[in-house]
Structure formats: structure tokens, C-alpha cells
A protein has these predicted regions:
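Ubiquitin-like/PB1-type beta-grasp interaction modules and other compact soluble beta-rich domains
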Residues: 1-90
Length: 91
């Protein structure tokens, strides 16, 4: 993966996403032109087969940006924290 620019962001993985990626978090350079969660996902999934498997079914993945629930259209910028996790239910 060729990344352009020097903007770092922290990517967090929880539950089975962590198991697939092999990481609880990673710091990545935010590629130029990537300004939403949806635009970031292809850059994550090309890192390894595990990353691709973790984000293969986006209907089963939730996202938060800077600890606020979001979706694929949520804007991201340098130094943001993006978390991917399975749906959470209360009870």
C-alpha cells in the first residue's frame, strides 16, 4: 500500500475484528483524498487477507470516530481515532 502525506490516525479493532487483523490498534497515514470512513476502508482491507476478512461484511461492523458513533459517510481528518467493532446490544 502506497500512502501519501503524513497524517497519522489511530485505527482500533475490537472482538472478532481484532482476531482477523491480528491487532488491537494500528497507526496509519491517512492517504490524501481520503476524507470519510468509507473512503478509508479500501486502504485498510488491502493491508492483509485478515484485514479484508475483518471488513468484508460492513453490515456486521459498527464504527466510531473519536468515540462518537458514525457510519461510512462520517468525515475523518488527521489525528482522528477510528474504531471498528461488532454491533453492541444492552440488556
Amino acid at each position: 500500500m502506497r500512502l501519501i502525506g503524513n497524517r497519522l490516525m489511530k485505527i482500533l479493532y475490537f472482538a472478532w475484528l481484532k482476531e482477523h487483523t491480528g491487532h488491537s490498534f494500528e497507526e496509519l497515514q491517512l492517504p490524501d483524498g481520503v476524507d470519510t470512513v468509507g473512503a478509508l476502508i479500501p486502504h485498510i482491507t488491502e493491508q492483509s487477507p485478515g484485514h479484508g476478512a475483518a471488513l468484508a461484511n460492513l453490515d456486521a461492523v459498527r464504527v466510531a470516530v473519536n468515540r462518537v458513533y458514525g457510519d461510512l459517510a462520517t468525515p475523518i481528518t488527521n489525528n482522528d481515532e477510528v474504531a471498528f467493532f461488532p454491533p453492541v446490544t444492552g440488556g
